[in-house]
Design a protein with these regions (language model features):
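GST-like domain detector, emphasizing the conserved glutathione-binding G-site
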Residues: 1-109
Length: 109
């Protein structure tokens, strides 16, 4: 199972979308950004940048933060959406989304 520490933001939503597409069992833990919960001690222990999203993979106790890294981790773990023959093409679009599209969506949020 995956624990997803998230908030209703574009970066938080993209991880839950992928988890749904992968049909993976997960639990969402909502971090209230308005109440500054991202700065509490417990969350700071798993997110060195105090940002969402973060996942905790309960199968192997791995913690992954940053949305792009999480997307890649999940795609590799579940062997879906990251084809070997088009790996670099997919990676280009993931990085493009993280670097350009994501920040614009965050500003519109």
């Amino acid at each position: 199972m995956i624990k997803l520490y998230t908030a209703p933001t574009p970066n938080g939503r993209k991880i839950s979308i992928l988890l749904e597409e992968l049909n993976v069992k997960y639990k969402s833990i909502i971090i209230n950004l308005d109440k500054k919960e991202q700065f509490n001690r417990k969350f700071s222990n798993i997110s060195p940048t105090n940002k969402i999203p973060v996942i905790e993979d309960c199968d192997n106790k791995k913690i992954v933060f940053e949305s792009g890294a999480i997307l890649i981790y999940l795609a590799q773990k579940y062997k879906k959406f990251l084809p070997k023959n088009n790996y670099w093409q997919v990676m280009q679009w993931v990085i493009f989304q993280v670097a350009y599209v994501g920040p614009m969506l965050g500003q519109a949020h």
